[in-house]
Regions:
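Charged DNA-binding/catalytic regions of mobile-element recombinases
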Residues: 1-177
Length: 177
C-alpha cells in the first residue's frame, strides 16, 4: 500500500491511496482524498480487507500517515505490517511501478479537475489495468486473466476498442458479412 500525489488544474494537491496484491498485480482498493489522516487510512483498509483473506503481509513505507493506529488495525486483522527502510522505494517496487504506470498511461495526459474527477480517472485506469493491460511478470496476461480469443474465421477483421477515452486500445475480432 502507498500514497501518491496528483495536482489538479487549480494546483491543489490530491492524495491517491491504493493497496496492491503483489501476486497478480491486482489493485485491491484505491481512493482519493484532499487530507489523508491515519483514521482515513484505517477506513480504507477496512474497505480493502473486509474479512480475513489470503493475505499475510502489508508492505508500507514510513509515511507519518501509517502511524500506530494503522499498525494496530493491521495486526488486529491478522496482517503483518512490513515497513520499508527510510527513503528506499525499491523495497516496495511493485507499488512504485504501479504509480509510474498510472502516471505515464493516464495522469500525464489528463489533468484532474477535482477530487471526483481524479477518482473517476483512477477507477477507469484500475479497470483498464485489471482487464486489458498486459504485464511481463504475468507472462503477458492481465491481473484478471484475460481470455485470448483465436481468429474465428479467415474473413474476420481486427477491430480497435478504445479504453481510457482513446488513450489506449484493446483489439478483438469482428466477423465481416
Amino acid at each position: 500500500m502507498d500514497f501518491f500525489t496528483v495536482p489538479t488544474v487549480t494546483f491543489q494537491l490530491l492524495y491517491c491511496f491504493f493497496v496492491i496484491a503483489h501476486g497478480r498485480r491486482k489493485i485491491l482498493h484505491c481512493n482519493v482524498t484532499r487530507h489523508p489522516t491515519a483514521e482515513w487510512v484505517v477506513q480504507q483498509l477496512r474497505e480493502a480487507f473486509p474479512e480475513a483473506g489470503p493475505y499475510r503481509y502489508v508492505i508500507l513505507d514510513r509515511d507519518s500517515k501509517f502511524d500506530h493506529e494503522v499498525i494496530t488495525f493491521l495486526k488486529a486483522t491478522g496482517l503483518q505490517p512490513k515497513r520499508t527502510s527510510v527513503r528506499a522505494p525499491w523495497q516496495n517496487g511493485i507499488a512504485e511501478r504501479w504509480v509510474g504506470s498510472c502516471r505515464r498511461e493516464i495522469l500525464n495526459h489528463v489533468i484532474a479537475l477535482n477530487e471526483q474527477h481524479l477518482r473517476r480517472l483512477i477507477r477507469d485506469y484500475v479497470k483498464y489495468h485489471h482487464e486489458d493491460r498486459t504485464h511481463d511478470s504475468l507472462k503477458k496476461d492481465t491481473p484478471n486473466k484475460r481470455a485470448v480469443v483465436p481468429r474465428p474465421s479467415a474473413s474476420a477483421t481486427v477491430i480497435s476498442m478504445p479504453r481510457l477515452g482513446g488513450l489506449h486500445h484493446r483489439y478483438g475480432w469482428r466477423e465481416v458479412a
